[in-house]
Amino acid sequence: MSYSTSEMMTVAAARRLRNGAVCFVGIGLPSKAANLARLTSSPDVVLIYESGPIGAKPSVLPLSIGDGELAETADTVVPTGEIFRYWLQGGRIDVGFLGAAQVDRFGNINTTVVGDYHAPKTRLPGAGGAPEIAGSAKQVLIILKQSPRAFVDKLDFITSVGHGEGGDSRQRLGLPGEGPVGIITDLCIMEPEAGSHEFVVTSIHPGVTREQIIAATGWAIRFADDVRQTTAPSEVELAALRDLEARTAAAHGQTAGEA
């Protein structure tokens, strides 16, 4: 069965969520991957959204954290303050699942501005709860499409800290948890190198070359000694993803695949 690079990215990201994990989910690509995991490999994953739903099981992907679908399908809904103070800062979030406009080699995220902060070329959507998720979740996964504009050598602004300047930078900042443990793109999967915490390519998606990855990265990307090939999406995974996208498109008046 044929599939797109975006579908490969979403499936690869979904596989990273273990069954039973408590996951703080960002809107957009993270939500799509997390809900695909819930519908396939990890039916007991607990999805938490910033607006207060715990155990959300949306039949269509939410447009925002305030989408009623999240509250209506959740096991319970609590105040936002409880989500951050009790669940996140209390060490009860296993995985924070985040998107990004830009990321650097140490998994730091920019969702604020491109260019000078006071006179930016582009004003991005902003932080939301991402800085707190990146700082306090036990682990963080990042999903975004790969290009030199998105994978940059130096961020104009660090919205959410990953591994800081590398090495023991995160520990020196006093941030709990492991920080980012994976960056999943439409070309490959990257993981932090032991010691330096610089992200290196550990798995390449089928049909993708090293040259493509190098060309799509704004720094001198390195490859692990043992680089795997990502397992292609199964028919079950693709069917679940496409059904989810079709339901979402019908509900929101979109074209399937835009969801």
Where are these regions (language model features)?
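N-terminal active-site beta-alpha-beta segment that forms phosphate/nucleotide-binding
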Residues: 1-74
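Conserved phosphate- and dinucleotide-binding cores of soluble alpha/beta proteins
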Residues: 61-229, 233
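Short, Lys/Arg-enriched charge-dense amphipathic segments
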Residues: 44-53, 71-75, 106, 121-125, ...
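Alpha-helix capping and helix-coil boundary motifs
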Residues: 4-5, 79, 118, 255-259
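A conserved C-terminal secondary-structure "cap"
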Residues: 225-259
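Structural signal for hydrophobic packing residues in well-ordered secondary-structure cores
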Residues: 17, 21, 37, 41, ...
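General structural feature for long, well-ordered alpha-helical segments within catalytic domains
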Residues: 5, 9, 13, 21, ...
